[in-house]
């Protein structure tokens, strides 16, 4: 298994206690793969301190900051892919930098952004 980056759809599904998401997350952790979550994805999903399942998922992830360099890459990807979703662009930029796959519920937009990044990562649909 390779590294993975989670998008907002994964966090939302985990917060809703979707069993398949939790099962796949556990398999990754047992294989020694710590999923990466860009901090802007957390911003997009976090609404309340009572989101226990969200915080539980994030405790098994590496939440990475949005660096200035990654922000510039994400901005270029938005232009190249003709996309408007800033958070998806950060997900794609992070995946490209880490040479990671992306777990997403937004296949089409992530695909365009990964293609714009000329990234080799695969998309794993929710």
Spans of features found by a protein language model:
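Short, well-structured N-terminal submotif of metal-dependent ribonuclease cores
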Residues: 1-37, 46-59
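Short beta-strand scaffold positions
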Residues: 37, 65, 86, 104-105
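Acidic catalytic patch
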Residues: 61-81, 107
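Short, hinge-like loop/turn segments at secondary-structure boundaries
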Residues: 52-56, 81-82, 120-122
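Alpha-helix capping/helix-boundary segments
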Residues: 10-11, 41-42, 70, 90-91, ...
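Acidic, PIN/NYN-like endoribonuclease modules and their adjacent C-terminal/linker elements
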Residues: 96-126
């Amino acid at each position: 298994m390779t590294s993975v980056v989670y998008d907002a759809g994964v966090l939302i599904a985990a917060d809703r206690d979707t069993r398949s998401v939790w099962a796949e997350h556990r398999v990754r952790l047992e294989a020694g793969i710590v999923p990466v979550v860009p901090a802007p994805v957390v911003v997009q999903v976090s609404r309340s301190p009572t989101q226990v399942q969200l915080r539980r998922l994030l405790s098994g992830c590496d939440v990475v900051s949005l660096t200035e360099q990654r922000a510039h890459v994400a901005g270029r990807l938005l232009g190249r892919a003709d996309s408007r979703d800033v958070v998806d662009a950060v997900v794609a930029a992070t995946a490209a930098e880490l040479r990671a796959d992306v777990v997403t519920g937004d296949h089409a937009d992530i695909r365009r952004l990964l293609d714009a990044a000329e990234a080799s990562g695969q998309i794993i649909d929710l």
